[in-house]
Amino acid sequence: MAAGMYLEHYLDSIENLPFELQRNFQLMRDLDQRTEDLKSEIDKLATEYISNARTLSSEEKLGLLKQIQEAYGKCKEFGDDKVQLAMQTYEMVDKHIRRLDTDLARFEADLKEKQIESSDYDSSSSKGKKKGRAQKEKKAARARSKGKNSDEEAPKTAQKKLKLVRTSTEYGMPSVTFGNVHPSDVLDMPVDPNEPTYCLCHQVSYGEMIGCDNPDCSIEWFHFACVGLTTKPRGKWFCPRCSQERKKK
C-alpha cells in the first residue's frame, strides 16, 4: 500500500476523534461544575448545622446530616463518572496510537520489500549491462586482432579459402600482417569461443602469420614467434611437423 493510502486511511479513522474528545472533555467539565455546586451546597448545610446546632432538634440535625451525606454521595458518583470518562478518553486515543504504530510497521515492511525488489532489479540490470559490455569488448578485440587495414584478412582453416599467404614463388604473395601484437596481449583479450585457433600454440590469429606450403597441413597457419621466425623466409616454407614428415620420406 502506498504511503498516501496509509495516511488517507489513518486520517479517515481519526476524523471523528476531535469531536469525541471534545464531547468527553465537555462532560468532564459538566461533572466538575456539578461537583462544585454540590460542594457549595454541602458548605451551606454544614454552616447551618454548626450555627444552629444548639437550637436544632434531633430530627432537624439528622435531616441536615442526611442532606450533607447525600451531597457527598453525589460528589462521589460524579467523581467516578469523571474517572470513567477519563479512562474512556485515554483508551480512545491509545487505540488510534496503536493503529498508527501498526500502519507504520506495515508501511516500513512494504518499503523494505520494495527496496529489495529494486535492488534485485538493479543487480540483474547491472549484470545485463556488464554482459553487453563484455560482448562489445570481445567484438572489439576480434576487430583489433584482424588488423587496421580493411584489405588484410585472417586465414580460415575450415574451408581453406584464404590461403593468401605462401612464401613460395608459386604464389608470390607476402605473408599477411596483423599489426604488432604479442602473444601476451592476445591472451589478455576476450576471445570468442567460436573463433578458430591456429598454430602449434592453438591460439587465435594475431600478429604476423605464415602459411605452410604443404597443402595437406592440418594446422596450415603459424605465428612467426611460435616457429622461430622474425622475417618472411624466401622460397617455400614448411611447418616443423610437415618438415619432419618430408624428412621421413
Curated annotation (Swiss-Prot):
Stretches the record annotates as Disordered: 115-160
Residue numbers marked as site, Histone H3K4me3 binding: Y198, M209, D213, W221
One GO CC annotation: nucleus
Zn finger spans (PHD-type): 196-245
Keywords of this entry: Cell cycle, Chromatin regulator, Coiled coil, Metal-binding, Nucleus, Tumor suppressor, Zinc, Zinc-finger
Function: Component of HBO1 complexes, which specifically mediate acetylation of histone H3 at 'Lys-14' (H3K14ac), and have reduced activity toward histone H4. Through chromatin acetylation it may function in DNA replication.
Protein name: Inhibitor of growth protein 4
Species the sequence originates in: Gallus gallus (Chicken)
Phylogenetic placement of the source organism: Eukaryota, Metazoa, Chordata, Craniata, Vertebrata
